[in-house]
Regions:
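Short, solvent-exposed loop/linker segments at beta-strand-coil boundaries, enriched for Pro/Gly
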Residues: 39-49
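C-terminal edge beta-strand
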Residues: 80-89
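Append "Rare intracellular matches occur via the same short Y/T/C beta-strand/loop motifs
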Residues: 64-75
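A structural signal for beta-strand boundary/capping segments at domain termini and interdomain linkers
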Residues: 33, 48, 79-81
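Solvent-exposed, low-complexity, repeat-rich "mucin-like" stalks and linkers
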Residues: 1-35, 41
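Residue-level recognition of secondary-structure-to-loop junctions
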Residues: 60-62
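Aromatic sugar-binding surface patches on proteins
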Residues: 50-54
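Short strand-edge motifs at loop-to-beta-strand transitions and within beta-strands
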Residues: 56-58
Length: 90
């Protein structure tokens, strides 16, 4: 089975910087934890960026709904990409 990616929060996030591993988790078909490889984020104004998991934080700097696509792979290199709509407030 392909990895399952989960978003760790319910409700709104506050503006600020988060590590991808604090926001998202992934498990493979055997229930083993997998790393999130990258996130593609589009802010409420339509600006996009990609964040490599080992390289930086996901920054939510304006209020609104962000679209975040998250990628994870398992040991067999099967890839899952999930999209989340994340509301951000002050």
């Amino acid at each position: 089975a392909y990895p399952t990616i989960r978003y760790a929060y319910n409700g709104m996030l506050h503006r600020g910087a988060y590590l991808p591993g604090d926001l998202f988790s992934a498990v493979d078909g055997m229930g083993e934890e997998r790393s999130v490889l990258w996130c593609e984020m589009t802010d409420p104004h339509g600006n996009s960026c990609t964040i490599e998991s080992q390289q930086g934080e996901v920054v939510f700097d304006v209020e609104g709904i962000y679209t975040v696509r998250v990628c994870a792979t398992d040991e067999a290199n099967r890839r899952s990409v999930c999209e989340f709509q994340i509301p951000v407030n002050r």
